[in-house]
Amino acid sequence: GYKIENTIIFESMITVDNILKLGDPRLYENCAPLTRDELPLVENWVKDLHEAMQDIRKRYGFGRGIAAPQLGIMKRLFYLHLDRPYIIINPEITDPSTDMFELWDDCMSFPNLLVKVKRHQSLTLGYLDENWEKQSWKVEGAISELIQHEYDHLNGVLCTMRASDDKSFKWKE
């Protein structure tokens, strides 16, 4: 064998370049539920999701959530970074309000495009956390919208498919 001196090996960082872009067929697929056996993989997946989100925030100035399929991980998992990190495994939405609100939505898979969509004002999110413990979270407003956006990704639905009408698109500088 031989020894290489003064060599620094950098672990590769996940960046915006790793995020699947609009048109990638994987973004339109239904994701599979995680099994308990896959729980040990979640830590690395979340690290990758966090790094991608941080890069988007740095370059584009937005990003509160990212879904596993956006990195080609076809599992029912998303990651939110709000007041603290939230790891959301096998989520289910219940009790969506009949009250809706309209907003301009953005997405890491097409960071320069805004899409006008209607979302439920409130909902309840049931999910498993990183310890495989059941959680229930009643949310409204901006957090409700964010959860609906990320949940859609797990079902192969993009906000472009929920546009309010055919004029509900605009470019973001």
Where are these regions (language model features)?
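Positively charged
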Residues: I8-E173
